[in-house]
Design a protein with these regions (language model features):
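Class I S-adenosyl-L-methionine-dependent methyltransferase catalytic core
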Residues: 1-180
């Protein structure tokens, strides 16, 4: 796994042993960042369910000013810090060890982009989306990007948000939502 483009292009990121973390495939990551490229300059990014930190790190590499990484697992947070050090992005990032629900319940920060790539086997995605739409952490015009397996439908009907489009890449679907 590597940083695809930007200031840290080509830097190899560490990945965990085992299958507990499922990093986004390079092809999907490339597509995601092509879709949101014009949203990135100077953006504040929340990488929820951060895992290795690869999505937030890619965002910083491509021009985001700051990324907040949130993961419930200590080993994941340690890995994110190591990957931030490899890319020299430590000063543009913060790593928080916390489960997503507690983090969102207490969050006072505002973001331009929220990246949601939770474990596929859980119900985290819809719960996190619901919480995000009920609290005020996304700037007006900001976007939420979700990653999910093709076989998992995503129902979304929250006032103040528009579902823009689904992008399919093999067995993976990216969905974008914009705050009105």
């Amino acid at each position: 796994m590597r940083v695809i483009s930007g200031k840290a292009r080509g830097i190899v990121l560490r990945t965990p042993n085992g299958m507990e973390t499922r990093p986004t495939a390079d092809r999907v990551k490339e597509a995601l960042f092509s879709i949101i490229q014009f949203e990135l300059p100077c953006a504040r990014v929340l990488d929820l369910f951060a895992g290795t930190g690869q999505l937030g790190i890619e965002a910083i590499s491509r021009g985001a000013s700051f990324a907040q990484f949130v993961d419930a697992r200590e080993d994941a947070c340690r890995l994110i810090r190591e990957n931030l050090k490899r890319t020299a992005f430590e000063n543009q990032a913060n790593v928080v060890r916390c489960d997503y629900a507690n983090y969102l319940a207490k969050c006072k920060d505002k973001f331009n982009i929220i990246l949601l790539d939770p474990p596929y086997i859980e119900v985290f995605l819809e719960n996190a989306l619901k919480m995000i739409t009920e609290i005020d952490i996304l700037q007006s015009g900001g976007i939420i990007v979700t990653e999910r397996p093709l076989e998992k439908e995503l129902s979304f009907d929250f006032p103040g948000f528009t579902r823009s489009k689904d992008y399919k890449y093999g067995k993976t679907v990216l969905t974008l939502f914009r705050k009105d």
